[in-house]
Curated annotation (Swiss-Prot):
Family: Belongs to the EME1/MMS4 family.
Modified-residue entries (Phosphothreonine), positions: T400
Domain ERCC4: 467-691
Role of this protein: Interacts with mus81 to form a DNA structure-specific endonuclease with substrate preference for branched DNA structures with a 5'-end at the branch nick. Typical substrates include 3'-flap structures, D-loops, replication forks and nicked Holliday junctions. May be required in mitosis for the processing of stalled or collapsed replication fork intermediates. May be required in meiosis for the repair of meiosis-specific double strand breaks subsequent to single-end invasion (SEI).
GO biological process, one term: resolution of meiotic recombination intermediates
Annotated protein name in UniProt: Crossover junction endonuclease eme1
Amino acid sequence: MTLQSTDSAIVIDSEADVDISSSQASPSKDNIALSEHNVITVLDTPQRSTQCDSLLKSFSTPLVSGSEDVLPSPRDALNITNKKSVTDNLLLSLTSSNQSTNTNLNPSSRVEIINLNSSPPNSLSSQPKHQEFHLFHTPTIPRTTQLSSKTSSPIVIPDDNEQVASPLSKKAASLTSSPLKDFQSSPPLSTVLQKSHSLHDILLDTNDDDHFPFTQSPLTKTKSFNDALTSSSSILKPCMPSIASPTSNRLSHAPSTPNLFPNQDSSNTIDLINNRSKTSVENQERTFNLTSDVHLDSPTSPSKHSSIEPNTSQEDSFQELPSLNKLSIQSRAFKKMRLPKISRTTDTPPASTSNSNKKNLDKLKKMRKLCSRSLEPYELDSNTQRKRKRYEDSLKKSKTLDKVDSLNRKMAKELDRKNSKELQKINKVKRTKEECLSEIILLSPDDWASSWYSTVRSQLDSYNCQFVVNSNQPKDSIMWKRKVNNVFNSSTNRFELSIEHEQIEPFALLRLKCRDFIKYIEEDQADTFFHEMSEKFKGCKLILLLEGIPNYFKSLKAELNRQYAAAVNSGTRPLLFGSLSKYQNFTKEKLESEIVRFSFEHSILINTSNDEKETAQWIVSFTGDIALSRYKHFSKFSARASTTEIGHVKSADRIENSLNFMLRQILRVTPNIANAICDQFDSIPSLIHHLKTHGEESLTNVVIQSSISERNLGPVLSRRIYNTFLCKEASSDAP
């Protein structure tokens, strides 16, 4: 017996009465007509799987046998005689009476058949590999249940896309490789009866509402296949009253099922069922999106099914079941009524639910990515949460530190750039008062907005000077401070940057009117006054501004002239006779001599002014000189020559280049010669010291390099350089 599967039918070849040798040798079996097959249409034909073959092997015997009590084995089936009983005649008459009903069926309805042939079973392994059983419910259009007779039963013509496979297409398979070889030995009668009863329980007593979930377990697949066959019990149960005959041992124990449609001629009922079935089937097909491909072993045209020729082979001995048209209609209508229940349970979910599920899935994917990134450094650590937090904290700190480091580097670069500019300004060769006034801070005992301080401030505001009030100072005095951010390095003869701070300048200015100064001299208190000022401005050079000397002597002369005029006008004898110098106790000459004495004895710088405006101008000038004094002071102790400041060597842009440009002024001294001498002597004093020590030919062996060759300076140029710097034998300078 061989099993052939398509999307629309399952064809099972029944056993033959011949042996293996006879089946292989007889070529007449190739043309066995389709009428020799027992055809049963089923609702759902699950695709075959290798796990389900064992189940099919157990009940793959013919439906009709010569015995009424036992289920014959394949080998016993081959020895059945061709005797027809009364029951067979009854079935044939019933089949012939129902032919007219069969022809009235709708030809467009889909019919799937199970073909039971009387040929020997082939090996299951010889079937095509692409034909597999899928253990899930396959919704299809309801079909007709039909049992074809050998002679008188008509055959239902299938659809255009359905072909019936040749039952003997694989006749070369041996009987020894058949799954039915386990039935070679005839079992006892009781065992066969038990098998028949158990098969009936499996096929007919299964719940109709069971569904077929898809599982991978072989046991589950077997059970699902049983359910798939028996869940369509509506196909077989209406047939039980007609099939339950003495010749059918397999279905003899089935209980009688009442007919669901007693009025079988009513076309309205069938049309109503067809409409309902059509709607439910469309819903199921849209839900499952099933596509079926029909694989045929031996395609046959529908015309072959209409003409059936009798066969004279050994298979005539088998008694075949007639086709029951009424039962097929009942099973089809019964299944149509049950389809909407399945379709309701398999409705597609709404679009909103799928959209929400998709959004949730996207969120889960994002969360998984975040978790995998955060846990990446600590995949093997058990304390994941604690490590993760520590890692995040360290990551934040590292990022913060990186930002701080980058900012520090940027600030350091900016500071270096700024410092380099400052150093260039500080080490500038030529410096002016205006450039240095921004470093000065002026201190006064009174408010700078009062009296003559306001005049000083108005003139120094444009130089960015600072003004501070210091109440500890004497009246009409000014002191200076400097904001310093560099230090002079005597070894390199350059200023270097340092921390900015304030330092007091060693200068103090005292403003004194000429009338007060003469009063101190007349009262012999001038020395005491200057000692007191030196103590208050200790460590500072005192600057004295005598304000109003010309005005004082002018007013004194005017006073004497007024007294003389008053005496003459009154007629009295005038007190003054001769020159005015006879009557003046303090003259200009005496004042000048006292100023010179105080300046030498007390080391005081004394200067005179006519009024407050001139005093303010003097203070501005003193402030500029004090601002420049620091740089002049350090320039005296440096090894830099003063020729650049004076302007003797105009081409020297820097002090270090002064010697080079001085040598170039000498006749026949080229830039290469000057560079060679400057490589050995970095300053003018060092060159002069060398010439004085080693004589006039001390530069003879100086190597002069050019792009072509090297040579020595020679004695002639050595003597010329010696005479130029030491001013000896000027006549030898001539070429």
